[in-house]
């Protein structure tokens, strides 16, 4: 017999189950992704996990699709599948529902960095940043991209005023008139819920490292430099540097001199 459980209660039960087995950053990743599921459940009027079906999970996938890169969608759905399987084991959803979650198929070259960044590697990068580059621009950029799955162009277009620390939101907006358009225009405008850990990081970045220099349109970019808004190529270079194993592990996987 199924036990009536709200989506938030189910997520908290799942987090309690994994928090002693997985790294803190991995647990934070799972919590963030499942907050998106809770948000969708609220909008869809789902207040009991007993009513979750394969069709409803497909509706969630459709809701999430188009707002994030395919690799990010796959990460979100993988976490959702693990969560739903936990719910099956705890008599919260009907048996077999988890198997109905279809993950997108990745083709070679679809990921932004040409190589798939695994959760374990991302956890290593975040641990490195927490110790040695806390709240720097590079740390902030990577943490936002990894936890939200937004495109780098959307991140570049964020202003300081788009960050709502009180409600834990980042507001993504299409602003072509001031050189920060979104790839899919108004269709992908949205407010992204972020975890408390990321809220604190952004606040610390703004307090400790942000230059507070306006761009050519009088806007103050969230990801800013002393010259104003960061160029897309500079943003990508920061990501590339941080995700190189020789940077965050101090070891080269190809046995090269790490100074090269």
Feature locations, PLM:
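Active-site/catalytic core of tyrosine-dependent DNA strand-transfer enzymes
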Residues: 197-259
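Alpha-helix N-cap/helix-start motif at helix boundaries, enriched for small hydrophobics
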Residues: 27, 80, 141-142, 149-158
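Hydrophobic (often cysteine-bearing) scaffold residues that line and stabilize catalytic clefts
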Residues: 30, 76, 137-138, 231, ...
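N-terminal core-binding DNA-recognition domain of tyrosine recombinases/integrases
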Residues: 9-112
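Conserved tyrosine-mediated DNA breakage-rejoining catalytic core shared by Y-recombinases
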Residues: 157-201
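Basic, Lys/Arg- and aromatic-enriched nucleic-acid-binding interface segment
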Residues: 119-152, 217
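Short, cationic motifs built from Arg/Lys/His that form the positively charged side of catalytic pockets
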Residues: 137, 151-152, 190, 210, ...
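DNA breakage-rejoining catalytic core of tyrosine-based enzymes
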Residues: 107-124, 180-196, 213-218
